[in-house]
Regions:
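Alpha-helical transmembrane segments
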Residues: 1-175
Length: 175
């Protein structure tokens, strides 16, 4: 029973362990080039992660719900930012584009360093994930303080938009 959300702590631990195992396997296969998840796979994993985190927040009333927002801020804001950008630019949402922060960082690494594509992809992922890991480590110190967690969210949005503007000016490639 993979998605049995009860109030029993063992059920939540079982789910978390199963989720970590599946996520680790998918990550390993993806890094080895044996599987490509694409946007649909990323959205599916995000859905399951979101369900678990919302349930976790609901069952732990002493932890600020803004902690969950901090944990999910990057993919949620990336999607929201892309939707607003595409609406403003009048581009179709179902067509791929290369105007995402991760693609600008990729172009930066490609232009500034002489790495092969696998190293560039790995470096781009490492930069974004390391930043988010640092944010998570800081946020965990304030799990009971909604005010601090809101400040962290606002600062992250500011950093994201600033980085986006900087990298877009310098490293946007033609679509």
């Amino acid at each position: 029973i993979f998605f049995n959300f009860g109030y029993d702590i063992n059920t939540n631990i079982d789910f978390l362990l199963n989720f970590i195992i599946v996520l680790s396997l998918i990550l390993f296969l993806n890094l080895c080039g044996l599987i490509y998840m694409g946007d649909s796979g990323a959205y599916l994993l995000s859905l399951f992660t979101g369900i678990y985190l919302i349930n976790f927040s609901y069952n732990n009333e002493y932890i600020s719900p803004f902690l969950i927002i901090v944990l999910l801020w990057y993919p949620c804001f990336e999607l929201l930012f892309s939707m607003i950008r595409r609406y403003k630019d009048k581009t179709k949402t179902y067509k791929p584009d290369s105007s995402h922060l991760h693609q600008f960082i990729y172009n930066f690494i490609k232009k500034e360093f002489n790495f092969n594509n696998n190293v560039i992809h790995f470096s781009t992922s490492t930069i974004i994930n390391s930043y988010n890991l640092l944010v998570f480590i800081i946020a965990i110190n304030f799990i009971y303080s909604s005010k601090m967690l809101i400040l962290i969210i606002v600062l992250n949005i500011f950093v994201y938009i600033s980085a986006y503007i900087f990298f877009k000016k310098k490293y946007q490639m033609d679509n």
